[in-house]
Each structure stands twice: as C-alpha cells, then as structure tokens.
C-alpha cells in the first residue's frame, strides 16, 4: 500500500484428501485380483498427476492380473461392460456380474482406451 513493499510468510499445505479415497482392493475371487482403486480427489490428482477432476476411479495398484489385460497404475477406470463407474464399490459390483468377456474403458493421458479380455 502507498508504494510500500511488504513480505509475508505463508505456510503451504498439501491438497485436501476429500472426499475420502475409499480405497478398494479386489480380492482373490474377483476378476482383477489385487487391483486397488480409489475415488479421485485433489490429493489423488496431485499424487498421480491426473487431469482436473476426471470421471471414474483411479487405479492405485494393478495387482498381478490387471497389467496382463492392459490396465496401468494411474488409469482412470470409467466404464466396465457399459456400466459407468463413479465410486470404487462400482468396480466390485460390475466385475462380480461379468460374463465370458469384459470390456473396460479407461482414461490414460487424456485419451479414452478400450480394453477387452475373456475370462
């Protein structure tokens, strides 16, 4: 003010981890056993360098099977067999009703990728 320079010290904090991540790890009987998914929030966006608020859930860990069908850590899982994925529990539900083949729509690097595999 009035031509004077002022210096301030501001404490920086990390991005909020809200809404909660609600991590879900798929179990032994699930199609993509060991894959871990979570809600996307500002903390996850920063940690995985994701685009601004994508729709879907983020793959935190792939487990052993998911990489074999093309799923990568940091992918945003948007659809399973045409069902929109909005929360981690949707992944468990959609995969539990999977038939002989499964299709996944993931967002990777700003592009949508279709992954298909047989059970």
Where are these regions (language model features)?
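C-terminal recognition in membrane/secretory proteostasis and scaffolding
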Residues: 1-119
